[in-house]
Amino acid sequence: MMWRWTLMLLLLLLRHWALGKPSPDAGPHGQDRVHHGTPLSEAPHDDAHGNFQYDHEAFLGRDVAKEFDQLTPEESQARLGRIVDRMDLAGDSDGWVSLAELRAWIAHTQQRHIRDSVSAAWHTYDTDRDGRVGWEELRNATYGHYEPGEEFHDVEDAETYKKMLARDERRFRVADQDGDSMATREELTAFLHPEEFPHMRDIVVAETLEDLDKNKDGYVQVEEYIADLYSAEPGEEEPAWVQTERQQFRDFRDLNKDGRLDGSEVGYWVLPPSQDQPLVEANHLLHESDTDKDGRLSKAEILSNWNMFVGSQATNYGEDLTRHHDEL
């Protein structure tokens, strides 16, 4: 039925967007395949020109940063003061904000969108409301309910969807560490955001290999790598950026210089060693605000530099406030 096809396609698109799965339509330079972890902000880090939006989103989270942009400077500073108290209370409650406490707060903010996305998925998938998400619940919520042997008989490209279903089940089994076919919230998070969990690394690599390894020899050849980035038209000259990608493949992707990528090289490419982004931002905020250079921040130091930490009507960029909260 057409309604089932439309609903299933919408669910798949929404969930696969949320999962951060490697996209078979990765754009130039292959950025869609590289998992850098959760970014602190998509805004440019441009403090030199008085643009503190990156810092605001790193410190508050994107949605809350928008809320602050609608406050008066006085309201913004008052709420920042309460955040400072919470940061110190979560640490050693000594009246100062240490580098570790600042980093912990930013890391907490960084993970908020993951928690929110998992909560939304949990509500969708836990159809019997028993506090767990079974594989059958997830499968039926995503793909629709079918009798055995009739899977996808009513949709176009049934074989593609059968492969997607098998791939999702394999990922679910890896995320389901206790093997009971019921996902806890932590296990569902691993299923939805595998790049955040070391034990999911192999499945991310396997899925990437399956997408790129067209001749099924277990490796990614340079032409397979390029084909994922660029589809040439007949007679079209290869763009300069594609030639640059070939060089990138040779110089930086193919670590053992055998002309192809094995599983470990694919893993190093799509899941590179990550920088501790919260620590980098915490050091930056500490450096910019620690006026007495004692290696920690007082509440007064933070409030005196409040426009770097948070925004207000005086520093906003014209965003419309889409939701309201009295407290964080």
UniProtKB/Swiss-Prot annotation:
Domain EF-hand per the UniProt entry, residue ranges: 75-112, 113-148, 163-198, 200-235, 241-276, 277-312
Binding site for Ca(2+) 5: D254, N256, D258, R260, E265
Organism superkingdom: Eukaryota
Residues the entry annotates as binding Ca(2+) 1: D92, D94, W96, E101
Gene3D superfamilies assigned: EF-hand (1.10.238.10)
CDD domains noted in UniProt: EFh_CREC_RCN3 (cd16230)
Biological process terms in GO annotation: collagen biosynthetic process; ERAD pathway; lung epithelium development; phospholipid homeostasis; positive regulation of peptidase activity; protein secretion; protein transport; regulation of phosphatidylinositol 3-kinase/protein kinase B signal transduction
Single annotated GO MF: calcium ion binding
Signal peptide range in chain numbering: 1-20
Protein family: Belongs to the CREC family.
Subunit architecture: Interacts with PCSK6 (immature form including the propeptide); probably involved in the maturation and the secretion of PCSK6.
UniProt-recorded name of the protein: Reticulocalbin-3
Gene that encodes it: Rcn3
